[in-house]
A protein has these predicted regions:
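Gly/Ser-rich helix-loop-strand patches that form or flank binding pockets
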Residues: 1-10, 33-37, 102-154, 237-282
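Small/aliphatic-rich secondary-structure junction motif
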Residues: 2-60, 159-223, 235, 241, ...
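Charged docking surfaces used in two-component/phosphorelay signaling
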Residues: 92-101, 223-229
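Rossmann-fold cofactor-recognition segment
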Residues: 86-90, 219-221
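A conditional alpha-helix N-cap/helix-loop micro-motif detector
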Residues: 24, 94-95, 125, 225, ...
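A short acidic, glycine-rich active-site loop
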Residues: 61-71
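Generic hydrophobic alpha-helical segments
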Residues: 31, 100-101, 182, 228-232
Length: 282
């Protein structure tokens, strides 16, 4: 970690709501891997119906960590914290999953929310307008969207691949935090030197930004003309992660509605990290 990137905290607490579907398995792997690398707190939540969920249906944390060969086979529950310095909590709640998630977010105040998405079949229920506004008022967390079936940074087998990050920047937002988050991701998860691709769409010149001093990254700058979302998705075909700035005044989720970021998340070939900024793609 370089002094320039140390000014922006990466992740100390993670929240991952799960519906126990196949589509959510890859998102779980990403949430677990980030918690493992950052030695931090992970809360996995399921809510719905008139009774609490079956604990056996929750994603198997210890079994997954054993498959990743970071825990010995048959390790006790206590080994997750004692051996790996990470805390994993499973929460089951009755009733509406969105309302339950909001309540938990208010208590936990996570730095990162990890969500599974279903691509062309629609974004999670969280992104409906009324729900989006409610969540936006209650959290400033970054949101990592992991499309079902995408090529993830983390595989179900625990393999890490992060070689190229796409970072679209606009004319007006302060790009510092987004750039720093890209560098931090490269330093933590990078497979060798990570290429950070700075993309600016429909501008005469590339907006100014500061490159933190780091040996973890190389840099490439692109300018393109055309529809912003379409262009970002075209360039993203060779990316492992997209980092999008969103409107800071309203929060990550609220800024997604009808935005370039929402369109990118729908069709992204890889995970998308939406992080708040002063202003962003609308």
């Amino acid at each position: 970690m370089t002094p320039a990137t140390n000014t922006v905290l990466f992740v100390r607490s993670i929240f991952h709501p799960s519906d126990f579907s196949k589509a959510s398995e890859l998102a779980f792997a990403h949430a677990l891997a980030i918690a493992l690398f950052r030695k931090t707190e992970l809360v996995i939540m399921h809510a719905g119906g008139d009774h609490v969920g079956d604990w056996a249906q929750f994603p198997p944390v210890r079994k997954t960590l054993e498959q990743w060969q970071v825990l010995a086979p048959g390790s006790p529950r206590s080994a997750v914290y004692e051996k790996l310095s990470m805390s994993v909590t499973k929460v089951s709640a009755k009733g509406d999953p969105v309302a339950a998630s909001i309540r938990h977010i208010e208590r936990q105040k996570p730095d990162l929310v990890v969500l599974a998405t279903r691509g062309r079949h629609g974004l999670p229920l969280w992104l409906k307008p009324s729900i989006a506004q409610a969540i936006a008022r209650r959290t400033t967390a970054m949101t990592l969207f992991v499309p079902s079936g995408c090529r993830g940074i983390v595989s179900m087998e625990g393999e890490i691949q992060l070689r190229r990050i796409l970072l679209p920047i606009d004319d007006h937002p302060d790009s510092h935090e987004a750039v720093v988050r890209a560098v931090r991701a490269a330093e933590v998860f990078g497979d060798g030197t990570v290429e950070i691709v700075i993309l600016h769409v429909n501008g005469e010149k590339l907006p100014q930004y500061v490159r933190p001093e780091t040996q973890a990254c190389s840099w490439k700058e692109l300018r393109r003309k055309g529809d912003a979302a379409v262009t970002i998705l075209e360039v993203a075909q060779n990316a492992d992660l997209i980092i999008m700035a969103t409107e800071g005044r309203h929060g990550v989720i609220d800024a997604m509605r009808g935005s370039v970021t929402e369109r990118v998340v729908r069709d992204a070939p890889c995970p998308v990290l939406a992080a708040r900024g002063e202003t962003g793609f609308e």
